[in-house]
Amino acid sequence: MDDVWYHTKSKQVIVIDYKSQANRRELTQRNYLSDVYHESYKIQLNVYAYLLQNMGFDVYPKGYFFVCNADRDEDGFYGKMNFEEAIIPYQLEYSNIESMILEMHSLMNSSMVPDSNIACENCAYARQRNSLGV
């Protein structure tokens, strides 16, 4: 967990995750949260909120990504990088985390190897590797 802020009015803790990137897309909530590679970031924030709640903390219903986006349009590096910063709100949803943990635990303790997921990039890599006999 990167950080926890305190909401002075609601008296709740706020889950914060710091991220850095060098993306040419405009840094908006919609662009950031709709990126397929950021799905795991949302899960990560939800898990942090779940853990805090189960430790007895009252968790604010929104978490935030503090994103630093490097400017890729500079002529050169010259010993410095410029960043655009944005705070991206995310509506937390962690009611399913416990069932996911139980499912993972069951899978880890099973002697059966699950079928691969056709949409999983890691599974595709493993299938390709296996087809090459590596």
Predicted regions and their residues:
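An active-site-proximal "capping" alpha-helix that borders the catalytic cofactor pocket
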Residues: Y41-Q53
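A structure-centric signal for secondary-structure junctions around beta-strands
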Residues: S10-Q12, K42, Y60, N117
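Short histidine-centered catalytic/ligand-binding loop motif
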Residues: R24-E39, F83-Q91
